[in-house]
Amino acid sequence: MGRSLKKGPFVSDSLLTKIEKLNEKGDKQVIKTWSRASTILPQMVGHTIAVHNGKQHVPVYVSEQMVGHKLGEFAPTRTFRGHAKSDKKSRR
């Protein structure tokens, strides 16, 4: 079940104010954020946002196709290291 339309999309207030300030200046800086639950809005297109993945900040360049998605979708939190090489031998 999605979010109610009358509420609107969730965006962190601090992140939104930083984006608006940069849009007024016309400046393109990397913005650090821990808010993975924030929805990407059309005002964010063209900016690079460093999203925290639990260990470090992953730079995410926002394009038009990303609008409506969450920031956390583009910063994976887990790394797949592969299965064990001798996995077939241990099954026998």
From Swiss-Prot:
GO biological process: one example: translation
UniProt-listed InterPro entries: Ribosomal_uS19 (IPR002222), Ribosomal_uS19_bac-type (IPR005732), Ribosomal_uS19_CS (IPR020934), Ribosomal_uS19_SF (IPR023575)
GO CC terms in record: cytoplasm; small ribosomal subunit
Keywords: Ribonucleoprotein, Ribosomal protein, RNA-binding, rRNA-binding
Job description of the protein: Protein S19 forms a complex with S13 that binds strongly to the 16S ribosomal RNA.
Listed PANTHER family: RIBOSOMAL PROTEIN S19P FAMILY MEMBER, SMALL RIBOSOMAL SUBUNIT PROTEIN US19M
Name assigned to this protein: Small ribosomal subunit protein uS19
Gene: rpsS
